[in-house]
Design a protein with these regions (language model features):
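Active-site-facing alpha/beta catalytic cores
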Residues: 2, 10, 82-247, 268-273, ...
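N- or domain-start disorder-to-order transition segments that initiate the globular core
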Residues: 2-44
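Long, contiguous binding/interaction regions
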Residues: 29-32, 60, 133
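Acidic (Asp/Glu)-rich catalytic clusters
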Residues: 43-46, 73-80, 129-133, 216, ...
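Conserved phosphate/anionic-ligand binding catalytic regions in large, soluble enzymes, centered on
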Residues: 51-64, 326
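Conserved, mostly hydrophobic/aromatic
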Residues: 55, 264, 330
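Glycine-rich loop at the start of a catalytic domain that most often binds anionic cofactors/ligands
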Residues: 62-74, 97-105
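Internal helix-turn-beta structural module
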Residues: 307-345
Length: 345
């Protein structure tokens, strides 16, 4: 193609072709719809349970992720009257320099090269197996907006990351999603960028999507995710403290957005990627909720990076259930945290 330095490797299947070849049955569709409604009720204040989005930084291998999900389902049964658990199953990962492991979408086997056709099948099969075997519909990051259609019948929650939140395509596509969309504050920390992103996602939009001109009605479930930020010198700063939450509450009023809500990401720059800090940060946020009805009403949930083993490893080191991207809280600590969060009033 003229003017492009690209090798066109192969044509990818259309979303409707993949959904036809790898379908889900009526029972799974019904289960997802039930969970979608529960998430919506939490974000709109009809359900006062806490939303807990928890799971690996990256879903790197099917066996370990499914092992984690089965354990999570057992704990969820003990706390479902107080918490709604939405597993993190992030199958594509942004990379600061564009190199390194980019997730299961790119590399279904982290030890082998990139294969996006196999990857798009692998991530659909993974989300399907989790829904079928545990009843969980999951959260994933919308890194590539046009790929959302491959998983649109499976995902219960979508996050727009710190690197993507300023991008117009991400904002416009988020406005057309039928599920909750969390918009993270950008890496540099400008909260107005996040608020403008929420405003765009909540508004009706027209744009080009997968070769179609489309029109949306806006997504009233678009909301904030606070994940900390980095300053001009690359130093991490948190934004989960009471005063940050109070400021966000006031901003929601100024912007006059629907359904004021925030999820606090306990890792990333809020923890300075010191993954063990996530436990303390979650407790701090829960304490802030107890101090103010405004903050309690605003903070709808928490996001935690958690896997089977503590910490992180390099690709190829081979420790089962240990993250190959950001360090995560191990299973026992995660289980204890979930049970503790369920005790808060």
């Amino acid at each position: 193609m003229t003017g492009m330095q690209m090798e066109f490797i192969r044509k990818m299947p259309l979303p409707q072709e993949l959904l036809r070849d790898y379908p889900i049955g009526a029972d799974l569709k019904r289960r997802k719809a039930e969970r979608d409604a529960e998430i919506a009720d939490i974000l709109t204040g009809k359900d006062d349970r806490l939303l807990l989005i928890i799971g690996p930084c990256s879903a790197d291998r099917e066996d370990a992720v499914l092992d984690y999900m089965r354990r999570l389902a057992q704990v969820e049964a003990q706390v479902r009257d107080r918490l709604m658990i939405v597993p993190r199953v992030y199958t594509n990962k942004p990379r600061t320099r564009g190199v390194g492991y980019k997730g299961m979408l790119h590399q279904p086997d982290p030890g082998k090269g990139e294969d996006l056709l196999a990857g798009i099948i692998a991530i659909r099969e993974l989300h399907t197996r989790i829904l079928r075997e545990t009843g969980f519909s999951c959260a994933d990051e919308m890194l590539y907006p046009s790929n959302y259609s491959y998983l649109s019948d499976l995902l219960g929650y979508v996050a727009v990351g710190a690197r993507s939140v300023e991008n117009q395509e991400h904002r416009l596509v988020a406005s057309g999603l039928g599920v909750a969309a969390g918009m993270k504050n950008p890496s540099a920390g400008d909260i107005s960028v996040m608020m403008n992103s929420i405003a765009a996602a909540q508004s009706p939009q027209e744009y080009i999507f997968r070769s179609w001109e489309v029109r949306t009605s806006g997504n009233p479930l678009a909301h904030a995710i606070l994940r900390g930020y980095v300053d001009n010198f690359g130093r991490s700063h948190p934004n989960y403290h009471y005063e940050n939450l109070r400021e966000l509450f006031e901003l929601y009023g100024e912007y006059q957005l629907a359904n004021p809500a925030v999820i606090v990401d306990a890792n990333h720059n809020n923890s300075g990627k010191r993954y063990l800090e996530q436990v303390r940060i979650c407790k701090d946020v829960m304490h802030s909720r107890s101090l103010s009805d405004d903050i309690r009403g605003l903070v709808k949930g928490l996001m935690v990076e958690s896997y089977l083993e503590d910490g992180a490893q390099k690709v190829g080191e081979g420790v089962y259930g240990r993250s190959i991207t950001d360090p995560c809280l191990g299973w026992e600590k995660s289980r204890e945290l979930i049970l503790r969060l369920a005790e808060y009033e």
